[in-house]
């Protein structure tokens, strides 16, 4: 019980200095997606930005690049990073689910006995190609039904 209390106390004092301008997911509708990173801490921070397939992966290389995969942010500083799509390699008839990963490495304090924890932020990123159907057409195509347990379900045949 004492060990659990100590661990809970340590976890409460940890916080992330990087924020993402209030975003918790991103939708990419073109070939570029600007992302704003903000260091809200009082010390510089290092951010490592990468992308990965959102599902279990296809074994293929991602057709994306990050403009600044490693970035140093001073205290209170804002910076823009762009996710760039090369224009081919993804389905054009539906959304693609990706994961945007940002590793927040804190500044070394210089104090002898200090525990520094790097935090990894993972965000959903949806690549949405320009689709021929409208959102209204997609909504009209939804079918609603109850499953055998009595829970309401919907079937969505549209690419949205």
Report each predicted region and the residues it spans:
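Buried hydrophobic-core signal for structured, non-transmembrane domains
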Residues: 33-39, 83, 98-103, 151-156
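Short beta-strand and strand-turn-strand segments in soluble, beta-rich domains
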Residues: 46-50, 54-70
């Amino acid at each position: 019980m004492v060990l659990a209390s100590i661990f809970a106390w340590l976890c409460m004092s940890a916080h992330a200095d990087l924020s993402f301008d209030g975003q918790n997911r991103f939708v990419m509708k073109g070939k570029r997606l600007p992302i704003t990173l903000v260091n809200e801490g009082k010390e510089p921070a290092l951010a490592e930005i990468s992308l990965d397939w959102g599902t279990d992966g296809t074994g293929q290389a991602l057709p994306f690049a990050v403009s600044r995969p490693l970035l140093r942010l001073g205290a209170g500083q804002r910076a823009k990073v762009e996710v760039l799509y090369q224009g081919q390699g993804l389905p054009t008839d539906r959304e693609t689910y990706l994961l945007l990963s940002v590793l927040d490495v804190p500044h070394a304090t210089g104090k002898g006995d200090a525990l520094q924890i790097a935090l990894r932020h993972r965000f959903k990123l949806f690549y949405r190609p320009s689709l021929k159907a409208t959102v209204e057409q997609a909504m009209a195509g939804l079918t609603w039904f109850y499953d055998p347990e009595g829970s309401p379900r919907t079937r969505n045949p549209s690419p949205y």
